[in-house]
Amino acid sequence: AAVVVLMVLSSPGTEGGNSERHFVSQFKGECYFTNGTQRIRSVDRYIYNREEYLRFDSDVGEYRAVTELGRSDAEYYNKQYLERTRAELDTVCRHNYEGVETPTSLRRLEQPNVVISLSRTEALNHHNTLVCSVTDFYPAKIKVRWFRNGQEETVGVSSTQLIRNGDWTFQVLVMLEMAPRRGEVYTCHVEHPSLKSPITVEWRAQSESARSKMLSGIGGCVLGVIFLGLGLFIRYRSQKGPRGPPPAGLLQ
C-alpha cells in the first residue's frame, strides 16, 4: 500500500510556566491494490496523539468515528467532503498506480506452475505423502489447498516457508499426509492474483496391479509397433522381383 503521512506539531506554552506540551496530529492516506487495479481500496486515517479517531474506508463509503473525539468530524466531513473523498479512489489511487511513479514490481504478475509428486513408491492403504510443488509465481501472496474426492483436507497438511528465487519469483511446497485407497482422487487447488481462475491438478490412487497392467499395455503397444515395422520391411524386400540369370560366361 502507498502511504502518505502528514504530521502537524503544536506546542503552546503552559500558563504560568515555561514548560511546553506537544500535540501530534497525523493523517495517513493509504491505497491497497489487488491484482493490479482489478480491485482498489482507499483508506484515510486521522490520528491524534497516536490514537486513531476518524477513518474513511472506500469499502464502507463514508467517514466513521473510531473514538468519541471523531464523532463531530465524521458528521462534518460526510456533509462537506464525502463525494470528493470517494472520488480519490480514481483520482489518487488509480492515477498513481498507472502513473510513471508506480514501481514495475507492483504491476508484475507471474503465474505459478503446479506439479504433484509422491514422496515414496505408491502402495495402497499405506502411509504416504503427496507433495504439491508450486513454483515461479509473483507476487508472493498465494493460497494452496488439498482436496480428497472433492472435500477439503485440513488434517495432515503442512507447508514450507516461501522460497525466493533469484529472479524475485517464489516457490512453496505443500504436503498432505495420507493413506491412498483405490479410486481416490486428490486435488491440489491453487489461487493466485495472476490467475483468472484457480489451478487444479489431480492425482489418482491406483493399485500396483493396475499400474503393472498399464505399463504392460504400453510395453505391448511398443512391441507391436516394432513387429509391425519389421513385417512391413520383410514384405517390401520379398516383393522385389527375382534376380535375372547370371551371364553365360560365368556359368561356364
Swiss-Prot record:
It comes from the Eukaryota. Residues 235-252 are cytoplasmic. Keywords: Adaptive immunity, Disulfide bond, Glycoprotein, Immunity, Membrane, MHC II, Signal, Transmembrane, Transmembrane helix, Ubl conjugation. It is found in: Membrane. Residues 112-200 form the Ig-like C1-type domain. Residues 17-213 are extracellular. Pfam families: C1-set, MHC_II_beta. GO terms for cellular component: early endosome; external side of plasma membrane; Golgi apparatus; membrane; MHC class II protein complex; multivesicular body; plasma membrane. It is a single-pass type I membrane protein. Residues 204-213 are annotated as: Connecting peptide. The lineage of its organism: Eukaryota, Metazoa, Chordata, Craniata, Vertebrata. Residues 1-16 form the signal peptide. Its main location: membrane. PANTHER family: HLA CLASS II HISTOCOMPATIBILITY ANTIGEN, DQ BETA 1 CHAIN (PTHR19944:SF101), MHC CLASS II-RELATED (PTHR19944). The chain crosses the membrane at residues 214-234. This is H-2 class II histocompatibility antigen, A-F beta chain. Glycans are attached at N35. Residues 17-109 are annotated as: Beta-1. It comes from Mus musculus (Mouse). InterPro entries: Ig-like_dom (IPR007110), Ig-like_dom_sf (IPR036179), Ig-like_fold (IPR013783), Ig/MHC_CS (IPR003006), Ig_C1-set (IPR003597), MHC/Immunoglobulin (IPR050160), MHC_I/II-like_Ag-recog (IPR011162), MHC_II_a/b_N (IPR014745). Ubiquitinated in immature dendritic cells leading to down-regulation of MHC class II. Belongs to the MHC class II family. One of its GO terms (biological process) is adaptive immune response.
